[in-house]
Every structure is written in C-alpha cells, then in structure tokens.
C-alpha cells in the first residue's frame, strides 16, 4: 500500500493550520537581515518580520535549502516507510533549491542504495499560495484515493494558468534590492508613482504605473479582469503584509468578481523579502499558457 508525503518549503506561504490539516511537510528557509539569521515560520511571525524589514538598514537575503538538508529529509521518509514523496520546492528560476533537491536524490542513492522511495520533483514556476493552495488540494485528493499520476497532472495543469498581480505601496525595498534604480525610486516616491507588477511563470513585469495609493487597487482588479476574461472556473486569493489596503482589495474583488476569495493570507518572509513589507497581491486563475 502506498504511503505518500507532500514536501515543500516556506515559500509556499501555507498557513500553519492548513499545513497541519492536510499533512503538508514544510522546510524553512533562512533569511539574513542586518546580520541576524531568521528561520522562516520559526524565529518570528510574519508581522514581526515586516516590521523588522521596515526598520532595517540592509536588504534581506535568503539562503537556499541545501542538498544535505534534503537528503536528510528523504532519508527520514525512507526510515518512516514512505513509498512516494511529491516534492514541490520554490520556483526553479528563482532559487538553486530545485537543483539542490536533484543533487539530494543522487546523495540518497549513495547513502541508501536499497531504498525504494519514489521522489516526484515538480517545478511550480511560481511562488506563495499560488502553488501552496493547490498542494492542499492535492493532499485532499490523495486522501480520497486519487492516483499520484492524476494529482500531479492536475497540479501542473493548474500551475499553467495561475498568475499574480502585485501592488507595492513603497519602493524602498525594491530600491534596496536593486530591482529599480535609486533615482527611479526617489522620483517614484516623490511623485507617488506605484508600479503594478505581474508575476507569471516566475518572471516579473511592470504592467502599469499609477499615481497615488488610491489608484493601486482599482488598477490591480482591472488588470486581473482583463487577463482572466472568459476563464472558466475562475477563482482568486488575496495576499498581504497586514496593511490597511488589504481590506480595500478584498472589497473591490468581491464587487468585481461577485464571489469571495478562496483565501486571504499573509505573504511570508521569502516572498515579502522581494516585494517589500507594504504590498498586496492578487492571485487568480488566468488562461492556460501551454
């Protein structure tokens, strides 16, 4: 009889209660900020980390989970009698974590040549609850008797149409990290310019620029409507960093889409380290990209 584990990392942003409910195994990233090493989901809450970023002098950096750490986790599954592990790490193009997992498979063969653990390593091509939610869906389907091959196909099919729109209310973090120039950030702040950014297939793109904080939410919702027009089984989620604009985004989405979000969730340390601590995100079903 199959015994299946679902393994991911803290970039998934799955709330702890959901992870426990569905039995999702989450490995934590380390985040270095002003010479202090934080273990995501362990050292502090998301809200505390947002505050630390706002007060920091430097830029947070994340360390990839190592092959040794993955090999130890795989060995644990072998010892506990698992037959399969579905491993979905952070987007391959944004971290060496995926390749480290590949290396760990080779290490496992050397350390446990007799093992029969099947490792299904998947690249979600995205971040946060864009894939985290569907890992929970996967876990529920497996519990109800679905085949591994079926849930993997369904997961990959879903990832092929998921998109994110980001609305950062401050350019400070993007300036610090070099994602925009210091001059552009200063001018943007002085003029109240806010970029509207999509994150699709692991790639970011500035889709629009609006002037004034009050224009951010309408622009995000309008862009989502345009990109999801005609999509069957449309759903959406809202990510946030505990800022007042979260409620504005949810209200606007409920009005525009005629339905509540699947989930309103906090952006974790890995994601907010890149977006900044004053950001809202709209995750939604777009058209298949093939």
Predicted regions, residues:
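Mixed-charge interfacial surface used for oligomerization/domain docking
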Residues: 3, 11-25, 30, 36, ...
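N-terminal glycine-rich anion-binding loop in soluble enzyme alpha/beta folds
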Residues: 5-71
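Short glycine-aspartate micro-motif
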Residues: 5-7, 85-87, 267
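Anion (oxyanion) recognition and catalysis
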Residues: 20, 79, 113
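Glycine/charged-rich beta-loop-alpha catalytic/anionic-binding loops adjacent to active sites
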Residues: 55, 83-87, 111-122, 264
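Short coil/turn segments at secondary-structure boundaries
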Residues: 58-65, 89-96, 125-126
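N-terminal glycine-rich phosphate/adenylate-binding segment common to multiple enzyme folds
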Residues: 69-101, 105-108
């Amino acid at each position: 009889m199959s015994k299946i584990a679902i393994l991911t990392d803290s970039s998934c942003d799955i709330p702890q209660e959901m992870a426990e409910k569905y039995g999702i195994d989450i490995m934590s990233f380390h985040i270095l900020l002003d010479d202090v090493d934080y273990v995501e989901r362990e050292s502090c809450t998301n809200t505390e980390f947002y505050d630390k970023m706002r007060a920091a002098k430097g830029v947070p950096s994340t360390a990839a989970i190592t092959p040794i750490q993955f090999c130890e986790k795989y060995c644990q599954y072998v010892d506990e009698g698992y037959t399969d592990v579905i491993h979905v790490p952070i987007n391959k193009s944004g971290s060496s974590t995926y390749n480290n997992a590949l290396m760990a498979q080779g290490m496992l063969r050397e350390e446990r040549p007799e093992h029969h653990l099947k490792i299904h390593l998947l690249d979600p091509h995205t971040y946060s609850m864009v894939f985290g939610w569907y890992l929970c869906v996967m876990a529920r389907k497996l519990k109800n008797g679905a085949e591994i091959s079926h849930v993997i196909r369904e997961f990959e099919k879903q990832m092929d149409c998921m998109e994110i729109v980001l609305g950062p209310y401050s350019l400070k973090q993007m300036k610090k990290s070099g994602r925009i120039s210091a001059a552009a950030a200063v001018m943007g702040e002085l003029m109240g310019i806010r970029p509207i950014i999509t994150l699709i297939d692991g790639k970011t793109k500035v889709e629009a620029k609006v002037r004034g904080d009050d224009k951010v939410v309408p622009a995000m919702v309008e862009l989502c409507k345009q990109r999801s027009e005609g999509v069957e089984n449309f759903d959406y989620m809202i990510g946030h960093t505990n800022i007042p604009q979260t409620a504005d985004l949810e209200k606007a989405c409920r009005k525009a889409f005629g339905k509540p979000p699947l989930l309103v969730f906090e952006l974790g340390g890995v994601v907010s380290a890149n977006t900044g601590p004053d950001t809202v995100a709209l995750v939604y079903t777009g058209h298949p990209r093939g």
